Amino acid sequence: THSSITTEKRIMDGNDVKTCTQTRPLFGQAAHVANLSLLFKSTKYGWEGQIAGSYTGKRLSDISNWYDDDIWEDGYMQLDASVEKSFKNGISLFAKASNLLDTPLLRFIQNGPRTENVNSERNNGNVIERKEWHGQSFMLGIRYKL
C-alpha cells in the first residue's frame, strides 16, 4: 500500500523541544510485497513438491515521538520447500524446509542529521538498531492414512 499518515513529532531546536509534523507510511505496511509458488504433483507416481518464495519490502517497525527517529525493518526474502512421496499402502514420507535463505531481520534508523554522529554499524548509511537471524528449520516425517 502507498497510504501515509501525518503525525506530530518532537524536534530539538537548540535547547528547546518544539513540535512539527511528519508524513510517513502506515505502520507495518510495505510498499512492495511479492509471492511466488511453484507446485508439482504426480498422482500416478505419488509425488508432490512445492517451492515458495516471498519478498516483503522495507516497512516501518517502531514509531518514535521524535522527528526522523522511527525504526524501520529492511526488506527481506524467504524461501521454503517441501516434498512428499505417497505409497499405495497409505504411508507417505515427507520433508519440509523453511527459511532456506536465512535472511537476517535488519532494523535500522534512517540516515539523517540525528544519526550522522552515531558510531555504530551501518547498512546503506542507516544506523543498524538490531540484526537477528531466525535460522532454518527442517522436518522429516511419516504419515499413515487409514
Annotate each predicted stretch with a short phrase.
Residues 1-60:
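Gram-negative outer-membrane beta-barrel transporters
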Residues 15-25, 65-70, 80, 125-130:
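Extracellular loop and loop/strand-boundary signature of outer-membrane beta-barrel proteins
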Residues 16, 71-73, 115-119:
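Short, intrinsically disordered/low-complexity patches at protein termini
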Residues 27-28, 77, 101-102:
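Generic, ordered loop/turn and secondary-structure boundary motif
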Residues 29, 42, 74, 86-88, ...:
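Surface-exposed coil/turn segments at beta-strand junctions on protein surfaces, enriched
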Residues 30-34, 75-79, 134-138:
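Residues that define the transmembrane beta-barrel architecture of outer-membrane proteins
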Residues 36, 47-51, 81, 93-95, ...:
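Transmembrane beta-strands of outer-membrane beta-barrel proteins
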Residues 55-63, 85-146:
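C-terminal beta-signal and adjacent terminal beta-strands/loops
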